[in-house]
């Protein structure tokens, strides 16, 4: 059975970020947290990279079944650089690091 994954992330818009998404079709009944594959995208179209080196990485953080569509999941993601560092627009990662530092 095919399953639709809708990857969702915040772009690099200034002064306000916007939601972006792209769809991937995978084999399987359903996807749980930790099962959604890492996926790449062209960051130049989302204000997250220059045209000459525009590869960015979507790292899934949380997966939810889509309540509006059968055989579909919503995949909430962070944006990372290809060198496995958080992208500068990745404010969630900055928050996680701050919370760890405070504890």
Where are these regions (language model features)?
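ATP/Mg2+-dependent ligation/transfer catalytic cores
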Residues: 1-103
């Amino acid at each position: 059975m095919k399953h639709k994954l809708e990857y969702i992330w915040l772009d690099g818009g200034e002064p306000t970020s916007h939601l972006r998404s792209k769809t991937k079709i995978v084999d399987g009944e359903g996807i749980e947290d930790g099962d959604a594959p890492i996926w790449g995208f062209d960051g130049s179209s989302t204000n997250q990279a220059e045209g000459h080196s525009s590869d960015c990485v979507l790292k899934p953080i949380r997966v939810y079944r889509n309540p509006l569509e059968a055989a579909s999941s919503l995949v909430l993601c962070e944006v990372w650089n290809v060198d496995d560092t958080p992208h500068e627009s990745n404010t969630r990662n900055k928050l996680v690091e701050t919370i760890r530092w405070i504890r």
